[in-house]
Amino acid sequence: MRNNPLIPKSKLPNLGTTIFTQMSALAQKHQAINLSQGFPDFDGPRYLHERLAYHVAQGANQYAPMTGAQALREAIADKTAEIYGYRPDDVSDITVTAGATEALYAAITALVRAGDEVICFDPSYDSYAPAVALSGGVLKRIALTPPHFRVDWQAFSALLSERTRLVILNTPHNPTATVWRQADIEALWQAIGEREMYVLSDEVYEHICFAVEGHASVLAHPQLRERAVAVSSFGKTFHMTGWKIGYCVAPAAISAEIRKVHQYLTFCVNTPAQLALADMLRAAPEYYRALPDFYRKKRDVLVNALAQSRLKVLPCEGTYFLLIDYSAVSTLNDVEFCQWLTEEVGVAAIPLSVFCAAPFPHQLIRLCFAKQESTLLAAAERLCKL
């Protein structure tokens, strides 16, 4: 008889609990203002609540189609056509997923095989690397450096090889709050040309873009979209992160492979919530057009409130995150500083180094401004005392 528990050999031995979970738990423990994890402290549109209740009452409580409710896929196709001038096929090209993270995982799993190389840009969202590792891929990283975090396209081209199968981009970019320009999208296309590789474009903050020229999507590029997967998030757009509904748009052949993975991960997504979102997209198309101004005001509240502090605010072109240089305040590294900030000052933030594989020597932290104005001002008051 075995005396000790059977412990599996980990496929992800170097990973623990995500920094977002850690910092939110620390914030709760010390009753700190939580500007760490990226979720709003206000609710989404009342209309969504009403439509959800309506569809529940109408009996839409069984499995949805594996690819997503038809009404929602049609609404997504129409929205995409309006914004990017391209209408994906709502039957073959759009897949509704349990949040954007599932779409990212399913796409990586579908496209990456053992030994394939995948390129991403650091700092990068922490779900990319585990998905690549679980597929047996080899992650190649290109460092983006502050304060502007622009892509070095010569370095990118030099990293390409016959084994390169996928490049993962994220714009607007979490955590740096930068956005790609149309010139970047074109540079990507020129670099990959006719290579047999794909593009995974994480565009979950597509409607939270403050750049004058707007959001540059791969879906607006006729050549790139033929080999690209674009991922978006209703949770980010409608302040409903707990609904965990996202989607991906890709050509039919790529979507077919993504769906093979999706059907054995979650099979389908919450039916009444999908129908409520379809109603929302139809009834209020002006909603997402107003989102940049909505978050720009929140960004400016926090930036202006920190103007008299010793903290340096980096440019924010998109997302609902703000990078802060605290080098004038402390010599602690960013992980130590965030812990101290939470425990002693009462404001929780995210250290930027956790988004990087290589040592990150910069003293930068990330704050989330998807909060009520009173929350932002209270946090800024504490930070101004540093």
State where each predicted segment sits.
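Conserved core segment of the aminotransferase class I/II
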Residues: N3, A220, R225-R296, D300, ...
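Active-site phosphate-binding strand-loop segment of PLP-dependent enzymes
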Residues: L144-E213
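A short helix->loop->beta-strand "cap" motif at the edges of active sites that frequently abuts
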Residues: G137, E194-M197, R225-E226
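Conserved PLP-anchoring active-site segment centered on the Schiff-base-forming lysine
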Residues: A110-V132
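N-terminal small-domain helix-loop-helix segment of the aminotransferase-like
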Residues: R2-G99, A106, M280-A283
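PLP-dependent enzyme catalytic core of the Aspartate aminotransferase-like
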Residues: D78, S157-A158, T331, W340-A349, ...
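A short helix-loop-beta submotif of the ANL/AMP-binding
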Residues: L134-K140
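Conserved glycine-rich beta-strand-loop-beta hairpin in the small C-terminal domain of fold type I
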Residues: A278, F294-V303, V313-Y326, F360
